[in-house]
Structures are given as C-alpha cells and as structure tokens.
C-alpha cells in the first residue's frame, strides 16, 4: 500500500469490503519489506486451494506476486495500480483505467500469459540489460531525494549514465545457437510492449503467443544513441540501421560479461555476469475486467 507517494491502505480496505458483499472471502495482507509480497503469494498458493491475488501497487509489487504465484494452476493474479510505475497495465489500452477498482475485477476473465524467466526470476513485460537498465537503477537510487521530483529523478539518472559513464559494455550474447561477441548498448527481451514509463521497443509483442522478441543495440557514440533512442522508444526499429539494431525471436538468450550486467525486470534491477533469458510459456493466470485484451493495440506480427 506504500508503493506510491500516498498511503492507500484505507482505500484497499474499502475495496475489500465491497468484494465481501459479493460473497467472497477476502483478506488484506500488508507487506513490510521488499520481497514480502512474493513470500505471501507463495504461501497462499501452496495451500492448493483456489485463490485470486490482487497485487496493490506498481510494477514492482506485481512482479513479486507473480514470482510467488507463477506455475500454480489454482492461482490467478491481477493488479490494482497504486504505485509510481504501472507500465504493465498499458498493454490493456483504455481498459487499464478499470483496474483501479476491484469492483471491475472480482468476476473477471482469466488470461494465461507467457513470462520471461531470467536466472530463475519471472518477468511479465520486458527484461532489459544495459544502459536502460542502469538508468532505471539510478532512478530508484535518486527517487528518495527530497530535491528531485519523479521526472527530475529520471532526467538526473539519464544525465549521470550518459555523461559520466560509458554507454556500452563488451558482452558475449548467445541467441539460441548463434553466438555474438561485441560491444552492446543494450539487449532487451520483450514479452509485453511497455517499459520505462511508456517506451514500446517492439509494438507487435504479445504476452500470450509463445514468442519473445529480443532487441540488440550495438554500442555507438552518445550523439548517435541520443539520435536513435526516440525511434527505438517508439517501436520504429525497422527504420534504424540494421548494423546498429536487430530484433530476433530466439527462445533462449544468454548474456555473459567479465563485469556486472545490470538487468531490469518489470522495473526491478538485478546484477549478474551471466544472464539467462528463456520463455516461460503460459506460466501465469492473470485476470482482468470482462472483455479486456492484454494485447490491445498490438501491431501486426
């Protein structure tokens, strides 16, 4: 309930009371620390009883609940957005607004969704490694500053990473059976379409088609990267030079480096020198408002 700037505990209890009016047994469980939502979710789904989990927070809270519930047929998950980042729900288009009220969710349809497995952690939307992940990590580090707004934190994070740190890193990238060793600015595996506040690197990505799109961007100068980033962010990768950017549909991607690789999973960052990304097909039961589409507005394949 503290994922955003304002405590939403009272609102959550009010929605729970309305769910009980539909004859549902409902519990409000509050987290006290990072990782708490995953532990609670795992404990509930391990009982074997049918359970519906409402993750009240942002993308990070939802990611924790998903990691606790993924792979359990008796469990379904949804999200009530009260956090500072809710890129996942953008995949539902105009129906995203309906997720703010549990009244729209309690009898909602279940959608089996694919996930990305990253070193054993599950990711809903996009797993990115490189400069964009480092920016995301810096945003979190700067977010508690009393002198910076949310937008100010983002701009400061971009400045720190672009001006004072190198963009690229030397990686060995394996795409199924193909091996590439080069300097990369970023590698992003896309199950969904949105991350980083609304960037859509692969607009045709769908969360239930058994296909993952991986974007590889070679290391280039700061000036060139700044020039192409808007096109990358808007999903116009086909308009960019093929020697700089490439999109593949490998099911298994591995990134290896002698230095730490920062990887961002649904807004949460991890460090590793060996990043393994694979498809977890139909791993999550997700429910939303009646008639909603998790691939609303997705471009043609």
Where do the protein language model's features map onto the residues?
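Gly/Ser/Thr-rich active-site loops/lids in small-molecule metabolic enzymes
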Residues: 143-153, 203-224
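ATP/NTP phosphate-donor binding region
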Residues: 1-53, 293-301
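N-terminal glycine-rich "phosphate-gripper" loop used for MgATP/nucleotide binding
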Residues: 55-60
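Short, well-ordered alpha-helical microsegments
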Residues: 37-38, 62-63, 272
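Glycine-rich phosphate/pyrophosphate-binding beta-alpha loops
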Residues: 128, 132, 188-202, 269
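ATP/nucleoside-binding phosphotransfer catalytic cores, i.e., glycine-rich phosphate-binding loops
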Residues: 8, 175-176, 181, 206, ...
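Catalytic core of DAGKc-family lipid kinases
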Residues: 20-22, 29-31, 71-185
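Short Gly/Thr/Asp-enriched flexible loops that form oxyanion-binding sites at enzyme active sites
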Residues: 61-73
């Amino acid at each position: 309930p503290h994922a955003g700037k304002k405590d939403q505990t009272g609102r959550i209890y009010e929605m729970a009371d309305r769910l009980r009016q539909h004859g549902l047994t409902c519990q409000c469980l509050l987290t006290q620390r990072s990782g708490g939502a995953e532990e609670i979710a795992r404990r509930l789904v391990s009982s074997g009883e049918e359970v519906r989990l409402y993750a009240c927070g942002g993308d990070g809270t939802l990611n924790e609940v998903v990691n606790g519930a993924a792979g359990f047929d008796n469990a379904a998950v949804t999200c009530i957005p009260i956090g500072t980042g809710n890129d996942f729900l953008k995949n539902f288009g105009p129906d995203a607004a309906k997720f703010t009220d549990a009244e729209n969710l309690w009898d909602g349809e279940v959608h089996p969704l694919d996930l990305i497995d990253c070193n054993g952690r599950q990711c809903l939307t996009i797993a990115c490694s490189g400069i964009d992940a480092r920016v995301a990590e810096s945003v979190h580090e700067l977010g508690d500053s009393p002198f910076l707004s949310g937008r100010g934190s983002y701009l400061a994070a971009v400045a720190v990473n672009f001006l004072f740190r190198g963009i690229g890193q030397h990686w060995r990238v394996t795409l199924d059976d193909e091996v590439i060793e080069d300097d990369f600015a970023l590698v992003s595996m896309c199950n969904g379409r949105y991350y980083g506040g609304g960037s859509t690197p692969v607009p045709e990505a769908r969360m239930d088609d058994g296909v993952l799109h991986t974007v590889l961007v070679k290391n280039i100068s700061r000036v060139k990267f700044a020039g192409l980033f808007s096109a990358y962010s808007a999903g116009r990768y086909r308009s960019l030079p093929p020697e700089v950017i490439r999109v593949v549909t490998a099911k298994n991607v591995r990134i290896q480096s002698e230095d730490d690789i920062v990887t961002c999973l649904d807004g949460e960052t991890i460090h590793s020198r060996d990043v393994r990304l694979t498809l977890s097909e139909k791993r999550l039961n997700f429910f939303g408002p009646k008639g909603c589409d998790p691939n609303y507005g997705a471009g043609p394949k």
